[in-house]
């Protein structure tokens, strides 16, 4: 058994020092290198947790792998939950990757509520983070939304905990190999039918070969800059959102001419105003709103199921009657 892992890692120390060790948690245990590493890490930090494994039955070996994980957890005196959803062939659905993720998260949420777990540990690492950031770049995400996954974030009212986001995959594998720990090699992670697998198997190696340098660390640096930008934007936005009022037509966001001199901030203020009402505005929609504000022209726009009225010096989300 691995007794201590990354004892001098300051980021891990900071993460676990902020954790309430009197509470109990879930660990999403796939059996791969990442989740097994995290399992031993949690044991070494005296975290009380239950491992949960979802066997989709996609591989011929998955039944035996689930049994092996159950035996390992029994050996390590770790409570273990096995879930087997109705078998689905991963080649039968175009959205199976996201569907499987949604199923897992709903399962984690239900278990946390039923058994009073305080959060779920997930084994995402630095390479996963880099993939997420590059994917968001290609999707055209806002500069303030390139921060990637957070070490702690709420899924509804359940905490998702990712302490490994700064640790590269190769260090995780090296640590397990040095202790002769066996882990599952999930072939579906290499199935290029899935976007993540294509990025991992083809895109990242290609970019690193052409660029001639590691691209993971610059992407992680970009995520750090994005997180700082997001924090700054939120600070700058707060005073404007405090001016939102209810009037006879709905929610009114007053817009002063001075704000319009900074289009980046003006559009972010509008974006957050819409988000606070549960509305996600695209870049093109925000640009349209900004253009009308700049010209002082009046416009009635549709955003999902709501009407947005733009006029000189203000934006109104009309009430639903």
From Swiss-Prot:
It is found in: Cytoplasm. One of its GO terms (cellular component) is cytoplasm. ATP binds at residues 30-35. Its EC number is 6.3.4.19. Coiled coil: none annotated. Pfam families: ATP_bind_3. It comes from the Bacteria. CDD domains: TilS_N. Keywords: ATP-binding, Cytoplasm, Ligase, Nucleotide-binding, tRNA processing. Signal peptide: none annotated. It catalyses: cytidine(34) in tRNA(Ile2) + L-lysine + ATP = lysidine(34) in tRNA(Ile2) + AMP + diphosphate + H(+). One of its GO terms (molecular function) is tRNA(Ile)-lysidine synthase activity. Disulfide bonds: none annotated. InterPro entries: Rossmann-like_a/b/a_fold, TilS/TtcA_N, tRNA_Ile_lys_synt, tRNA_Ile_lys_synt_N. GO terms for biological process: tRNA modification. PANTHER family: TRNA(ILE)-LYSIDINE SYNTHASE-RELATED. Belongs to the tRNA(Ile)-lysidine synthase family. The N-terminal region contains the highly conserved SGGXDS motif, predicted to be a P-loop motif involved in ATP binding. Ligates lysine onto the cytidine present at position 34 of the AUA codon-specific tRNA(Ile) that contains the anticodon CAU, in an ATP-dependent manner. Cytidine is converted to lysidine, thus changing the amino acid specificity of the tRNA from methionine to isoleucine. This is tRNA(Ile)-lysidine synthase. It comes from Chlamydia trachomatis serovar L2 (strain ATCC VR-902B / DSM 19102 / 434/Bu).
């Amino acid at each position: 058994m691995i007794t201590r892992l990354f004892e001098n890692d300051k980021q891990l120390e900071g993460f676990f020092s902020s954790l309430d060790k009197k509470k109990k948690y879930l660990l999403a245990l796939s059996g791969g290198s990442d989740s097994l590493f995290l399992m031993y890490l949690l044991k070494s930090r005296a975290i009380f947790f239950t491992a949960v494994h979802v066997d989709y039955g996609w591989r011929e070996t998955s039944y035996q792998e689930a049994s092996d994980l159950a035996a390992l957890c029994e050996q390590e005196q770790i409570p273990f939950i096995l879930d087997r959803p109705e078998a689905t062939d991963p080649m039968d659905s175009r959205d199976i990757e996201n569907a499987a993720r949604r199923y897992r998260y709903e399962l984690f949420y239900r278990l946390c509520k039923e058994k009073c777990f305080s959060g779920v540990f997930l084994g995402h690492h630095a390479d996963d983070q880099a993939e997420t950031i590059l994917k968001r770049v290609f999707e055209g995400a806002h500069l303030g939304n390139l921060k990637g996954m957070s070490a702690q974030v709420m899924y509804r009212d359940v905490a998702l905990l990712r302490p490994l986001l700064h640790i590269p995959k190769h260090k995780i594998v090296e640590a397990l190999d040095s202790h002769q720990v066996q882990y599952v090699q999930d072939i579906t992670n290499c199935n290029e039918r899935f976007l993540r697998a294509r990025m991992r198997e083809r895109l990242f190696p290609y970019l690193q070969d052409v660029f001639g340098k590691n691209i993971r660390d610059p992407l992680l640096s970009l995520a750090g800059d994005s997180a700082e930008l997001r924090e700054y934007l939120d600070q700058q936005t707060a005073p404007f959102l405090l001016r939102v009022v209810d009037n006879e037509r709905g929610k009114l966001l007053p817009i002063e001419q001075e704000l319009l001199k900074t289009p980046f901030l003006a559009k972010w203020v509008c974006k957050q105003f819409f988000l606070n009402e549960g509305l996600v505005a695209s870049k093109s929609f925000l640009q349209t709103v900004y253009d009308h504000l700049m010209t002082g022209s009046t416009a009635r726009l549709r955003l999902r199921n709501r009407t947005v009225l733009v006029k000189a010096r203000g934006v109104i989300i009309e009430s639903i009657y």
